[in-house]
Amino acid sequence: MPNADSLVKLVPMERPITNEAGWRGSPDLWLEAAYDALIESGVEAVRILPLAKRLDLSRTSFYWFFKDRGELLDALIARWRDKNTGALLRQTDAYAETIEEAVLNVFDCWFDCDLFDPAFEFAIRSWALQSEKVESEVQKADVLRLRGLSRMFERFGFGDDIADVRARTIYLVQIGYISIRTHEKTALRLARVPYYVEAFTGRAPQHKELNRFLSRHVEDNSFQLNKIIPINEPPSDAS
């Protein structure tokens, strides 16, 4: 039976992640650098040598984690798909007692970049103008997102046709905002929320629903929507 010393020699050592130049990085590090370059300058900036310089790593370090630039670009698309499409679909499925509350759940995406990244969305859609492959990915994402929004309306009793139209209204308005790079103060955007909800659903949201929404996006508890734009409380159901 081998002794402890010989057992150590028999165990294969994990390959080191350093070379003469230092740390090789990691897949996530290279992907994050690619993301930053895409957001800042578009897909043409996502190239191995500039990324290596950005990370202060050797060019050859890249090939420890990705076969080539194409594989890195595929990883960027997958990251966008998982983050933005994934988040939107989760929000359409989130618990809600009313369609107004369900729409407010979706609006979380428009106010929280950790959920839905508008800069990433803009960059991918700009890239799609140059690439049929990426355009196809965007079209697939659009279909999935619209289906998710339509199903959300159907859960609350809307017919197929009107659910589809309302879903498109919500989605295409927001994609339009992103595409033309609209910049508005957060307070103004928040003040418009109840009116967007009513426009998209045909029903005014209740104060309790708006307050829950605000609690997720406003740190200052003194912020009140009705101090900016008056909101009418819908009448309560007769008991």
Language-model regions: role of each:
Residues 29, 37-75:
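Helix-turn-helix
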Residues 23-35, 51, 76-84:
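Generic hydrophobic, amphipathic alpha-helix propensity
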Residues 1-25, 204-239:
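N-terminal intrinsically disordered/low-complexity leader segments
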Residues 117-122, 132-158, 162-168:
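Amphipathic alpha-helical packing segments from all-alpha helical-bundle domains
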Residues 89-122, 167-170:
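Hydrophobic alpha-helical connector segments
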Residues 66, 112, 124-130:
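Short helix-capping/turn signature of helix-turn-helix
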